[in-house]
Amino acid sequence: MQKLKQQVFEANMELPRYGLVTFTWGNVSAIDRERGLVVIKPSGVAYETMKAADMVVVDMSGKVVEGEYRPSSDTATHLELYRRYPSLGGIVHTHSTHATAWAQAGLAIPALGTTHADYFFGDIPCTRGLSEEEVQGEYELNTGKVIIETLGNAEPLHTPGIVVYQHGPFAWGKDAHDAVHNAVVMEEVAKMAWIARGINPQLNHIDSFLMNKHFMRKHGPNAYYGQK
């Protein structure tokens, strides 16, 4: 697990580097599917002092199997998503400013241009609000459940992120670094959408044929973007 702990540590350290977190906000995890174990950031530990050895290993029930610290308070959300979506290898949660603003407004981040379409096939959805019962019960688990409810049967890697109403963004990918990459993009397109709608409040969504082209040339079966 040392290699995965190092990867998760490095991915967590990318959050302050890209301006996605303040203080100890945010967390990144990754899963070892063969062992059924998840590595995640410890709760409330400052990035400035955090080390790879501080990463916490939990099983799929959330029991700590390795580590001196308590795991992130959002661990149950991560685990619920890993259980539901076998294609996920890494998950990140932040409170990045612009993506969180869309979450607090209760609005999906609209697909307005090709930067968005290069990564997200359509709007980045916003979940419904959790009920008082859901919040007072197993809050973090129910956060995972409402994300799943919102995504439905969609392929999560085609929509590698979501904003949870009144809370903030979650993003995911094939591994921890990919998840952080998608979180960075989500923050950027959230900012772009806010600016664009401020310039033109009547701005419509990107044309569907242009969105399809940009997403499929990068992620489709005949993708030709980048190097092999």
Swiss-Prot record:
Keywords: Carbohydrate metabolism, Isomerase, Metal-binding, Zinc. One of its GO terms (biological process) is pentose catabolic process. Substrate binds at G26, N27, S43, G44, S72, S73. InterPro entries: Aldolase_class_II_sugar_metab, Aldolase_II/adducin_N, Aldolase_II/adducin_N_sf, UlaF. The active site is at D118 (proton donor/acceptor), Y225 (proton donor/acceptor). Disulfide bonds: none annotated. GO terms for molecular function: aldehyde-lyase activity; L-ribulose-phosphate 4-epimerase activity; zinc ion binding. The keyword Nucleotide-binding does not apply. Coiled coil: none annotated. HAMAP family: UlaF. GO terms for cellular component: cytosol. Pathway: Cofactor degradation; L-ascorbate degradation; D-xylulose 5-phosphate from L-ascorbate: step 4/4. This is L-ribulose-5-phosphate 4-epimerase UlaF. It catalyses: L-ribulose 5-phosphate = D-xylulose 5-phosphate.
